[in-house]
């Protein structure tokens, strides 16, 4: 588990290209994962995380599950998609695992629920910026989790945003539409499941 903001050997499961850097970029800067698994790419031409991993000599796996929007819900996903995610993660049994908690986007919640049901000792990062929007009621959502650590450093936050700008140029509109959340320069928060209140969505 996280010890002083570092993990010895871990994989990162991101929902979409950019989710790992946005939610865990400060961790990434000082502690690179062995592998990043990108779940929802939809378009196989999407090379954003692929290029990041190549530059930093990190293994990268793209599951190419269909992109789903908040409007779509999870109706596009089938049992084979769930099986594909589980079987891929099982290949890294000896590794620590980090993913997003699932607050604020149905795709994030779908992934989080499956990981909770099938794997132990997973670290969940607070979704940025989704979980900071009032309608997502993070305080209620987070009752199912126990906080492990927060990484707070304005300089590191700026560095992770520079990474975001460099590798995820097509997503830079977030810096405008969600500006007030970026201006907060919030800590990165990491949690584990509260086994007394296990949540499956």
Task: Please state what every model-predicted region is.
Residues 2, 48, 55-58, 72-77, ...:
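The feature marks non-catalytic terminal segments
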Residues 1-120:
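Active-site beta-strand->loop->alpha-helix modules in alpha/beta enzyme cores, enriched
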